[in-house]
Amino acid sequence: MNPNTIDSIIKQLIASHTTISTMESCTSGLIASLITDTEGASAIFPGGYVTYLNETKVFVGVDPSVIEIHGVYSPECAEAMARTVQENLHTAIAIGITGTTGNLDPNNADSVQGVVYFCILYKAQAHTFTFQTNVSGMTRHEIKQLYAEQVFAELELSLIHI
């Protein structure tokens, strides 16, 4: 992951006064951490959530029926996560991400190894993405970095239209 690219994205958000928030599951707060690596990020990043458990997602406001109907590992859940954090923190952009970082999740039957779902929400417009890769031989940290790279790559493309 190129830190200069992320820095450039965050500086663009700062310059345009465009706020951003995150709700992360499989990346465990890495996206938020990378956002705040840029000096001045507090001007556009009020915070985010790390919601590793389904119960935590529901606690912060994700509708439990989304998880029950579509599963926690789904584009619908990623979008619900983004909408929830956007509503709670009143940001222009919100990111929701859910998926697995290794073995299948015994607590969620819908888990597929190496598949991540994320949503970039700008105002009310949702863009959902599914990314699948072979994660065998990768550490959990490497997988999280790969997923974060995908999010920032799509965010960079989205900013062209903002």
PLM feature spans:
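Short alpha-helical segments enriched in small residues
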Residues: 1-160
